[in-house]
Amino acid sequence: IVIAGFFIMKNTAKEFMPSLNEGSFLLMPTSMPHSGVEENKRVLQQLDMAVASIPEIETVVGKAGRTESALDPAPLSMYENIIQYKPEYMLNENGQRQRYKVNYNDLFELKDGRFIANPNNSENVTLSAVERSQLIPDNNGEYYRNWRTEIQSPDDIWNEIVRVTKLPGVTSAPKLQPIETRLVMLQTGMRAPMGIKVKGQDLKKIEAFGV
């Protein structure tokens, strides 16, 4: 019984399905409730530009507010920025890691004859805007890393996002993923920007208090 209780306690408050790596983040900060349309538009553009300046980011698309809906209302001061970040290594058309040709100086060779620094072993190298079509596939070569040396995990990318999106009058946001966040919203059934949890011993009294 003790052993069974230990395993039950260990897995309490956990879901059967583990958290998936979606390859993207959902940034949901908010600004001042009284801010106008033009101000919210300006802040949203600043957020998009700040996130896009991170080398590991592929695309970022943001929006302010949502249409008036009883299911999921959101004012203009609530932002949603969907951020797609690059995979750690360059992938081929099948979505698998591909090795690319390097020369004797450990530089990646491009199809046009140019050479670029290898981000795998160069600490201070600036990542170049290199497309997969520019590199030469070679099974004896090396993987081309899309992330800087100091970026070792998606958490590091999120920390960079938090750092660059610290704007006056804008709140911070927890680390979210788009699909995971939508599933949580559907499970909770929240239909307002703010919710109150009511607990008690009698369901009828809880219902009466909530209504």
Model-derived regions, located:
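Aromatic-capped interface at the extracytoplasmic side
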Residues: M9-S19
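Short extracytoplasmic/periplasmic juxtamembrane "stem" segments immediately C-terminal to an N-terminal membrane anchor
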Residues: L20-G36
